[in-house]
Design a protein with these regions (language model features):
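Peripheral, non-catalytic segments flanking oxidoreductase cores
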Residues: 1-314
Length: 314
């Protein structure tokens, strides 16, 4: 058992091989075992990542009063700035030690999904802010849909199965700032143990130590991606669709120790969602003898709102 624990690690795959049978087999095994995978050669340009992150480092360095001008009271953190002391992991008594910004999908006036998606918040004082945010959102979105072609093949579905089910999803790009730790101990951690609500999450910026995944054996496994790599995990919506065949795994971001406690941490998760009116119901191939009893169907938007209330964003 000890030897198995020592060898446990999150697999690393190259997105350049996404169409190969080997990639499909490997990502399927990773998601059944861990719910997580590390992706290299993801195709998001480093220049775009650096430009995007630099803009938010500028914003998060502003004073609290300056930042709160971009917080939408009563908006549930759907867009713009969410300050410290609000988001709390499901079942936790302590809020997460982070502040963040949300960017959503841009839809034209009159679009039938507009009432599901709040308007984005833009900062005129930061050059190219809107342009860069939209470019980053769209790039993440394309990358996620490309990964979903492999996940569809894992499930013995057509590669384009997910395309019309996520192309107008209420997906969210979040930019998180975890500040340097205070000198006094705290009961809160940077991000309490939780599962993601959505279909899949694509995460950049996980190189700084702290991200951990809860294994089937009930042990916390550190995720250590190479610089520039992306971490991609299964969310609760995909777990529900597959009746648990693909795992939405508890994960957390623990507080750093020693000199690392002096470092801020920035990360960029993209939460890819189904279209709001997509009914999440267990796939027929994931139901039957030896499988769990499936949960009842629920619309993606209803499920999202239910879960947002649990984490105190509603």
């Amino acid at each position: 058992m000890q030897n198995a624990r020592m060898k446990a690690h999150i697999p690393t795959l190259s997105l350049a091989e996404v169409e190969t049978p080997q990639f499909v087999s490997a990502i399927g095994e990773a998601y059944e075992q861990y719910g997580f995978v590390i992706i290299e050669n993801h195709g998001i340009p480093q220049e775009l990542i650096d430009r995007f992150l630099d803009q938010f480092k500028t914003f998060f360095a502003w004073t609290e009063s300056e930042k709160r001008r971009f917080h939408i009271e009563g908006g549930g953190g759907a867009r713009g700035y969410t300050p410290f002391g609000i988001e709390t992991a499901k079942g936790s008594a302590h809020f997460d030690l982070k502040e963040f910004w949300h960017i959503g999908r841009e839809l034209p006036e009159g679009h039938p999904y507009r009432h599901y998606m709040a308007d984005n918040v833009w900062i005129d004082a930061i050059p190219r802010f809107r342009e860069t945010c939209i470019e980053m959102f769209d790039t993440f979105d394309r990358t996620g849909r490309r990964l979903l072609t492999a996940i569809a093949r894992v499930l013995k579905l057509a590669p384009d199965y997910f395309e019309d089910k996520v192309q107008l999803g209420n997906s969210v790009l979040r930019v998180i700032h975890y500040p340097p730790m205070p000198p006094n101990p705290t009961e809160s951690i940077r991000a309490g143990a939780h599962e993601d609500i959505n279909v899949i999450t694509l995460l950049l910026g996980a190189e700084e130590p702290g991200l951990q995944v809860l294994t089937k054996q009930g042990e916390w496994l550190s995720v250590n991606p190479a610089p520039g790599s992306m971490v991609v995990n299964v969310g609760d919506m995909l777990q529900r669709l597959t009746n648990g065949a693909l795992r939405s795994t508890s994960h957390r971001v623990i507080n750093p120790v020693s000199d690392r406690a002096k470092n801020a941490r920035f990360s960029m998760p993209f939460f890819l969602h189904f279209n709001p009116d997509f009914p999440i119901a267990a796939l027929p191939s994931c139901v039957g003898p030896g499988r769990p009893e499936p949960l009842p169907p629920i619309l993606a938007e209803e499920y999202l709102q239910e879960r947002l209330r649990e984490i105190k964003l509603k």
